Amino acid sequence: GILDEGSFEAGFGFDGSSVRGFQAINESDLILKADLETTVIDPFFAKKTIAFLCDVYDPITHEAYGRDPRGITKRAEAYLKTTGIADTVYFGPEAEFFIFSNVSYEVGPNVSRYYIDSHEGFWNSGSNDASMVYLNRIKEGYFPLPPLDKTHDVRAQMVEIMEKMGITIEVHHHEVGGGGQAEIDMRFDTMLKMADQVQLYKHIVKNVAARNGLLATFMPKPLF
C-alpha cells in the first residue's frame, strides 16, 4: 500500500503467530511501528527502496510488546540506569562469518548429507585450476594477502555499503579458518544501536555475497 503520515502513527499490522515464540494463532495480531531514526536506503533492490526497523506493539493495549527484542533491549538499558552502576553500556561484537562458493544438502528416508565448498578450501589442491595453487593451510588463514585471500574484494564491497548505511567499520580481514572465514569489525556503540546494526550487518553480508554468486553464513562452525 501507499505510505502516508497515518501509516507511521497507526503502524503496520502483521501475523504474530508466524513469528516463532511470539503469539498463538488465536490471538495473532500485532503492530509494527517504524523507528524513523533507523531509516536507510536499501541498495539491494532494483527500485529505490527505503528500509527501517520497527518496534512491536499490542493492538489492544497499544503498549510495547513484551517479547519484542528491541523493546527488551530498551528496558535493559533503562534498568541499568536505575541500578546506579552506569548510565550507558557499550557493546562491540566481533561478527565473523564464512563465505562459500557452493553449499548443498539433502535429507530423506535413505540419505542424509551436506556438501560445502570454498574457492579457498585446501581440499581443492588437486584441481586443474591454476588459481588453486594458492590455498591456505588448515587453520592458517589469519591475515593472508591475495592471492591466498580470495575474499578481499567481496569484503571490501560489504564494508563500502556498511559505511554508506551508517555503520562505522574499524577493520576487515581474513580469519583463521582457511575456507572462506571472514571478519568485519564494527566500532562499539550503545546496546540498542549495536543490536540494530548487527541486523543490518547480516543483511548486507548475505546480499553482497549473493550478488557475487557466493553464500555467506553466520553458523559458528560449518567447517572443522
Regions found by a protein language model. Give the residues of each.
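ATP/Mg2+-dependent ligation/transfer catalytic cores
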Residues: G1-E170, M191-L200
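A short glycine-rich, hydrophobically flanked beta-strand micro-motif that places a catalytic Asp/Glu
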Residues: E94-E96, E170-H174, L215-L223
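Short, conserved phosphate-binding/catalytic loop or strand-edge motifs used
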Residues: A95, E175-I184
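Acidic, glycine-rich loop-and-beta core segments that form the ion-binding/anion-interacting portion
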Residues: Q181, M186, K193-F224
